[in-house]
Amino acid sequence: MNKYLAEAFGTFWLVLGGCGSAVLAAGFPDVGIGLLGVALAFGLTVLTMAFAIGHISGCHLNPAVTVGLWAGGRFDTKDVAPYIIAQVIGGLIAGGILYVIATGQAGFDVVGSGFAANGYGEHSPGQYSMLAALVSEIVMTMMFLIVIMGATDKRAPQGFAPIAIGLCLTLIHLISIPVTNTSVNPARSTAVAMYVGDWAVSQLWLFWVAPIVGGVLGAVIYKNLLGKESND
């Protein structure tokens, strides 16, 4: 049970820290943290939680990571569904707290602001198409899993995995925030989409399908190509 609670708490922190920075701080007058700050915030949530709960649950915080690690032979089948449920619950609680905080500002419009929801077409920050969003999310999540698999490989330098994984997530956000607002995490997308409703819910399917496909691809590529012992 501890590992499921850890995943819920960890995903809670990822959503509150990452989406919270986007909603509350990104465009704050004069001292807003901007795109770079939001990207760094997401990376820092994973970095801090990896040290806090990595030894308890592995610090997945993401259904695409859980399914990817399972596909890569690094995770037990019986824990896949409970992990995903815990991640979604933790994210939704964080989304609710963020909603309460954000709507405490006079005139705040959840739907109009986007509430850090992920989207494509007219709801993409840069007006990118559904195809562009699909490709971006698949490729970014694929690379995320390759980094996770490599950084946690027993042959990798020990103790540096949280840093590599956190920085990778920061880089992913720097690349793809303009395209989809960056998901690579179905729990993160669900956590805010449920409070926006409307278009965010109707487009949510892409932010489940693409990250999971990308996660499986990345894990399988690492397991079968990059992760094999070399005879050279």
Curated annotation (Swiss-Prot):
Coiled-coil residue windows: none
Q: What is its main location?
A: membrane
What function does the entry list? Channel that permits osmotically driven movement of water in both directions. It is involved in the osmoregulation and in the maintenance of cell turgor during volume expansion in rapidly growing cells. It mediates rapid entry or exit of water in response to abrupt changes in osmolarity.
Give the motif span (NPA 2). Answer: 185-187
The keyword Cell inner membrane is annotated on this UniProt entry: yes
Motif NPA 1: where? 62-64
Q: Which domain of life is it from?
A: Bacteria
Give a GO cellular-component term.
plasma membrane
Tell me where it resides: Cell inner membrane
Q: Which UniProt keywords apply?
A: Cell inner membrane, Cell membrane, Membrane, Repeat, Transmembrane, Transmembrane helix, Transport
The similarity comment for this entry is: Belongs to the MIP/aquaporin (TC 1.A.8) family.
**Which reactions does this protein catalyse?**
H2O(in) = H2O(out)
Recorded hits in SUPFAM superfamilies, A to Z, give: Aquaporin-like (SSF81338)
Q: What is known of its domains?
A: Aquaporins contain two tandem repeats each containing three membrane-spanning domains and a pore-forming loop with the signature motif Asn-Pro-Ala (NPA).
| Transmembrane stretches, start-end | 8-28, 33-53, 84-104, 130-150, 159-179, 201-221
Which residues carry the site feature described as Selectivity filter?
Answer: 42, 173, 182, 188
Q: What is this protein called?
A: Aquaporin Z
Q: What InterPro entries does UniProt report for this protein, alphabetically?
A: Aquaporin-like (IPR023271), Aquaporin_transptr (IPR034294), Aquaporin_Z (IPR023743), MIP (IPR000425), MIP_CS (IPR022357)
Read off the PANTHER family from this record.
AQUAPORIN TRANSPORTER, MIP17260P
Subunit info here reads:
Homotetramer.
Signal peptide (UniProt feature, chain positions): none
Q: How does it sit in the membrane?
A: Multi-pass membrane protein
**GO function terms (MF aspect):** water channel activity
Q: Where is this site: Involved in tetramerization or stability of the tetramer?
A: 19
